[in-house]
């Protein structure tokens, strides 16, 4: 015989068991089930020999015997997020997962006859194994033809540029680092009860051709790429790159809509100087982004600002433009929920969409050593994830994660945190039906610079 994982419905809900298929008789099946699952009582209806030979799972109900509590776990656990997530998983489809398995077997050929799991192919062509395969983001399809990007709900694009950094370089390798560690993740999140593979379509379009020795030409390339992706209807996800790209990304988004855009910006630094070293460096993006007519500074919210790396030259611009600033002390005093509420109120006030810019250095440098301007005293990882989830619930028109510098990282933990910010954002929007909500604001054709 052989085993198969099956899902069965009981009076208490669905359960999954490994079912032994014995191509002889129901009696043999019963004895096999008792040997594999001694804690289960099994009720079955007679199956024909033909159905057994076809390896169809027997329709049955199961009654787990759970340590003196009858058919129920401890009453208090029925109300936990953990148990509700387990129940909600049963509602998720598995169609695309199965299609991916079949595609892998078709393209990668069938596995050796010695391998019992016939869902495995000879060549790695899908999600598994996590240590193999080509490093696209989350092993999403690589779309070389940009004309096809609109076929997907979201598109990942790399902006490998560190020509705007003023201290430690290396963020040009950020997109590679994030893609590499993204192989670690599956598309399913237990707590959210979200499966990105089943509930959305994601692609990776590769990297923008940046010009290392020319900031302005690189900015034009980035604006064109983001504008094109947004105009196609796909949700743009930009992998930085230093934070100088925060200006051209917003410019690209703003170029394909007449609507008003707000910005929620996580950072330890204000990034609102007009110039730094006579150029538009990574300390300047929001001076220039908020000069765009449909991106007013009063809709800019900056979360986590503070410490010893905020240049005084930036502060008069914050006052003059009336931006909305939240320090770490504010977060500690007000709490995460209140800060998120204030951020949403300000960013969305008279706005039609919100762009998310997440600088990885907003997180305490003990957790993200791989960045250009590390600063102690920032957000803890769970605080960052909580805040991102709260602001993403209302929907976004695009996002970027910047300042990941793999040469200064340890064991990929900074890249991993950047990855988590992205997938939590996507998962939150999927869970709340907000992915794609930006499409109605796209009312202008894409015009390259």
How should each PLM-predicted stretch be described?
Residues 1-5, 399:
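Conserved small/polar residues in nucleotide/adenosyl-binding loops
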């Amino acid at each position: 015989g052989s085993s198969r994982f099956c899902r069965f419905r009981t009076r208490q809900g669905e359960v999954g068991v490994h079912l032994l298929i014995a191509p002889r008789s129901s009696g043999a099946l019963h004895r096999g089930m008792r040997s594999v699952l001694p804690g289960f009582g099994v009720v079955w209806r007679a199956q024909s020999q033909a159905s057994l030979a076809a390896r169809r799972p027997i329709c049955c109900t199961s009654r787990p015997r759970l340590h003196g509590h009858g058919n129920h776990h401890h009453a208090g656990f029925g109300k936990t997020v953990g148990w509700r997530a387990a129940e909600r998983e049963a509602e998720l489809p598995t169609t695309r997962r199965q299609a991916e398995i079949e595609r892998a077997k078709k393209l990668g050929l069938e596995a050796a006859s010695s391998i019992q799991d016939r869902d495995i192919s000879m060549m790695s062509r899908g999600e598994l194994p996590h240590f193999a395969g080509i490093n696209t983001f989350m092993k999403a399809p690589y779309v070389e033809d940009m004309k096809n990007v609109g076929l997907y709900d979201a598109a990942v694009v790399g902006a490998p540029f560190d020509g705007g950094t003023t201290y430690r370089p290396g963020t040009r390798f950020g997109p590679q680092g994030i893609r590499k560690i993204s192989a670690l993740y599956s598309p399913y999140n237990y707590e959210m009860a979200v499966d990105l593979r089943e509930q959305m379509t994601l692609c990776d379009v590769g990297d923008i051709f940046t010009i290392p020795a020319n900031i302005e030409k690189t900015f034009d390339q980035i604006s064109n790429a983001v504008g094109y992706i947004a105009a196609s209807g796909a949700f743009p996800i930009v992998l930085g790159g230093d934070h100088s790209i925060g200006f051209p990304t917003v410019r690209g988004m703003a170029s394909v809509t007449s609507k008003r855009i707000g910005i929620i910006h996580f950072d330890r630094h204000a990034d609102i100087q007009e110039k730094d070293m006579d150029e538009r460096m990574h300390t300047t993006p929001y001076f220039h982004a908020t000069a765009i007519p449909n991106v007013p500074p009063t809709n800019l919210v900056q979360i986590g600002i503070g410490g010893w790396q905020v240049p005084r030259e930036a502060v008069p611009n914050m006052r003059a433009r009336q931006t909305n600033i939240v320090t770490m002390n504010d977060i500690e005093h007000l709490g995460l929920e209140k800060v998120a509420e204030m951020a949403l109120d300000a960013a969305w006030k008279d706005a039609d969409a919100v762009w998310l810019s997440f600088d990885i250095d907003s997180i305490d440098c003990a957790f993200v050593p791989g960045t250009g301007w590390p600063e102690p005293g920032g957000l803890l990882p769970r605080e960052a994830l909580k805040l991102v989830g709260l602001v993403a619930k209302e929907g976004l028109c695009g996002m970027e994660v910047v300042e990941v510098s793999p040469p200064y990282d340890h064991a990929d933990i900074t890249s991993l945190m950047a990855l988590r910010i992205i997938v939590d954002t996507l998962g939150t929007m999927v869970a709340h039906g907000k992915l794609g909500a930006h499409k109605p604001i796209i009312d202008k054709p894409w015009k390259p610079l």
